[in-house]
Amino acid sequence: MSASTTATTRHDWSLAEVKALFQQPFNDLLFQAQTVHRAHFDPNRVQVSTLLSIKTGACPEDCKYCPQSGHYNTGLEKQKLMEVQKVLEEAARAKAIGSTRFCMGAAWKHPSAKDMPYVLEMVKGVKAMGLETCMTLGKLDQDQTLALAQAGLDYYNHNLDTSPEFYGSIITTRTYGERLQTLAYVRDAGMKICSGGILGMGESLDDRAGLLIQLANLPEHPESVPINMLVKVAGTPLAEEEDVDPFDFIRMLAVARILMPKSHVRLSAGREQMNEQMQALAFMAGANSIFYGEKLLTTANPQADKDMQLFARLGIKPEAREEHADEVHQAAIEQALVEQRSSEMFYNAASA
């Protein structure tokens, strides 16, 4: 299969086709992925996001990989929903270190009616700073999805995690169909989709291919596809899983790039365990988005200055964003904070 043919956007990939991509010689696969990547993106630009946990721990879901699950004793400090003011301050700091997108994650099965007003104010406030907004809050119903869209949310993250066949071995508290339904609600509301999965949970090659097929065969490809490497946390059922072979992880990125040529493929959780050479291969394979800053929800993430040093050595620059004068952003931040101070939710979000 030539690189030129795979640059065409498709939604009808078969398991045999995708496994054949995985099984190519490594150099051939990287060449094909890089060729597809260059057809749609500047190969030396990477989109930079910051992720903030706005509510941590005590999640009722039983995802075997997750330290935030209330089913496992991982020693994670539980935190209630963050105050809106604090979220806006963190967003301003993310913008100052170069992020163009601010992602907010809450450890919920689904957001409750009492929490939604605070969440919507967070979206509006971050949006006013000139940042793209992204949230991951669990399963959504149609009304919640429409409310988030009306508040200005740009992206909603809802990962499929793995193939439909392996999914039941990892999670029992939410069905695969529910995840797909949430993605459909998000798309119907006009928001962009961020959806990917995790490597290193004991899945097979068929499962890795199956995950990518689910994503690539959606009616529209996700705009962002995060590929995570399992971060093994003591106390979770997957704490003793074998490490992912670095070349297998790079293959996953490359095949994701080929199947979804216009999507941003994000090098996500697990990057702290990757050396610079592995990260460079990831960018060569077509990864063009990273999380940037100190923490990725509850796991360490390479420090921002290390990222910029690596970018400089590789000749990579952060993806351009629409810029406004600093005083305009400052005015937006100040206005958002003033509005929050005049609202009861500004004070009560953490205890609601």
Swiss-Prot record:
InterPro entries: Aldolase_TIM (IPR013785), BATS_dom (IPR010722), Biotin_synth/BioAB (IPR002684), Biotin_synthase (IPR024177), Elp3/MiaA/NifB-like_rSAM (IPR006638), rSAM (IPR007197). Coiled coil: none annotated. Residues 44-262 form the Radical SAM core domain. Transmembrane segments: none annotated. It catalyses: (4R,5S)-dethiobiotin + (sulfur carrier)-SH + 2 reduced [2Fe-2S]-[ferredoxin] + 2 S-adenosyl-L-methionine = (sulfur carrier)-H + biotin + 2 5'-deoxyadenosine + 2 L-methionine + 2 oxidized [2Fe-2S]-[ferredoxin]. Keywords: 2Fe-2S, 4Fe-4S, Biotin biosynthesis, Iron, Iron-sulfur, Metal-binding, S-adenosyl-L-methionine, Transferase. [2Fe-2S] cluster binds at residues 103, 134, 194, 266. Pathway: Cofactor biosynthesis; biotin biosynthesis; biotin from 7,8-diaminononanoate: step 2/2. Binds 1 [4Fe-4S] cluster. The cluster is coordinated with 3 cysteines and an exchangeable S-adenosyl-L-methionine. Its EC number is 2.8.1.6. GO terms for biological process: biotin biosynthetic process. It holds the Pfam family BATS. Disulfide bonds: none annotated. [4Fe-4S] cluster binds at residues 59, 63, 66. Catalyzes the conversion of dethiobiotin (DTB) to biotin by the insertion of a sulfur atom into dethiobiotin via a radical-based mechanism. Homodimer. Belongs to the radical SAM superfamily. Biotin synthase family. NCBIfam families: bioB. This is Biotin synthase.
